[in-house]
Design a protein with these regions (language model features):
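Surface-exposed loop/edge segments in extracytoplasmic proteins
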Residues: 48-54
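Surface-exposed, proline-anchored Ser/Thr-rich loop/turn motifs
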Residues: 3-31, 43-48, 79, 98-101
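Beta-strand signatures of extracellular beta-sandwich domains
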Residues: 39-43, 52
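Short proline/glycine-enriched turn/loop motifs at strand-loop junctions of beta-rich domains
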Residues: 33-37
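Extracellular and select intracellular beta-sandwich modules with Ser/Thr-enriched
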Residues: 91-95
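Short, surface-exposed loop/turn motifs with a glycine/proline- and acidic-biased composition
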Residues: 54-89
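Conserved beta-strand and immediately adjacent loop positions that scaffold enzyme active sites
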Residues: 39, 66, 96
């Protein structure tokens, strides 16, 4: 049998956060088929950057990061719709998530 952790993703992907809607914490999952410099940002619906969760060169694999609904200063953000975006090499993808209070 093959261990799933040995199987690498075939394509870059940003997956839907879980849980969604969420309060107070959600997990953002993403797939890296190759080593890449990864940046993950949180934006509000006006396009303002709220936080940066990842800024690192990462090895290929199935990865995840948690967001605790705080901004870059550690302050809780208000309920609403937020965007999360991955930039990994040339790959960019954005998804929506909902924070309930």
């Amino acid at each position: 049998s093959v261990d799933e952790s040995d199987i690498l993703p075939e394509v870059f992907a940003l997956r839907q956060n879980y849980p969604n809607p969420f309060n107070p914490v959600t997990t953002l999952r993403y797939n890296l088929p190759e080593q890449a410099t990864v940046n993950i940002f949180i934006y509000d619906m006006l396009g303002r950057m709220i936080n940066q969760l990842v800024s690192a060169r990462q090895e290929p694999g199935y990865r995840s990061v948690q967001w605790d609904a705080t901004d870059m200063y550690g302050k809780s953000v208000s309920a609403g719709i937020y965007l999360y975006q991955i930039q990994a090499g040339e790959f960019v993808q954005t998804r929506k998530m909902v924070l309930l209070k």
